[in-house]
Amino acid sequence: MPIVNGFKVGPIGLGLMGLTWRPKQTPIKQAFELMNYALSQGSNYWNAGEFYGINPPTANLDLLADYFEKYPKNADKVFLSVKGGTDFKTLAPHGDPESVTKSVKNALTRLRGKKKLDLFQCARVDHKVPIETTMKALKAFVDSGEISCVGLSEASAESIKRALAIVPIAAVETEYSLFSRDIEKNGILDTCTQLSIPIIAYAPFCHGLLTGRVKTAEDLKDFIKAFPFLRNMDKFNPKVFEKNIPFLKAVEQLAQKFGMSMPEFALNFIIANGKGMIIPIPGSTTVQRAESNLSALKKSLSSEQLEEAKKVLDKHQIFGLRYNKQLESTLSI
């Protein structure tokens, strides 16, 4: 099992953003059933956010506090990671000591003492503030025992090294999927491997493109209707999507060859390539979806199959940015 800050976690975590960061929040009963199921299956690395809500922005943490109030015995079984340091309205990163301190204290307040804040990380690195300054502010909370450890999100290899000089880094969260393999080339994977820092892979299905539900332009249109925020992402532009269809077909063919569904293949590629050091955190809002995601653990890719997959996928050019031109500047800083 992977280990984060000395805590044993399952090979697949649980992203909680979708439970609350949408116009219609997931019903509490449904959310609790999902969380209980995930935990019962060993999916105990939970990824939350201080700003993962609409009204209020803190709905994600409020949900967690309610959950652990109802199921207090589960608090010590879950490793809770919380992202913050972000402006609620603009989502701009704020890494200055005052903002970071306010963010951590707010997260602790919202959790109402029902669950320890195991890991806190700023959602993005603030390019206006030296990362050493941000890390010193967070280190104070580790030293006081108010949080257990510090993580990084969307940090470059250089920033990881600089942050580590100030405080131990328990995990680095970054986008990683068959569609977004940047960390294999930009030094992040190598750096984390050398420093034995686990990587938390968000968006392992590339925001839905690798679920098998989006194969045609018509599928894309319906998918965007269900998830309007995707309109702003390059890969969901119809013209860009058309260019990526050959890649999607290659993924589907590989999945079939290895006896897996597309989501199972997407997750097993990450797990196999991580060798116990990369933990994907697919989001779920239902027990059925979590069950489908965790079914990937019943299968695996051999080292030979992994290399075969890489050779096939490397032949295809991937079109479109990870997000869009405006947001790309906030990634891997």
Swiss-Prot record:
One of its GO terms (biological process) is pyridoxal biosynthetic process. It is found in: Cytoplasm. One of its GO terms (cellular component) is nucleus. It catalyses: pyridoxine + NADP(+) = pyridoxal + NADPH + H(+). Its main location: cytoplasm. The active site is at residue 52. Its EC number is 1.1.1.65. Keywords: Cytoplasm, NADP, Oxidoreductase. InterPro entries: Aldo-Keto_reductase, NADP_OxRdtase_dom, NADP_OxRdtase_dom_sf. The keyword Cytoplasm applies. The keyword NADP applies. One of its GO terms (molecular function) is aldo-keto reductase (NADPH) activity. Belongs to the aldo/keto reductase family. Catalyzes the reduction of pyridoxal (PL) with NADPH and oxidation of pyridoxine (PN) with NADP(+). This is Probable pyridoxal reductase 2. It comes from Schizosaccharomyces pombe (strain 972 / ATCC 24843) (Fission yeast).
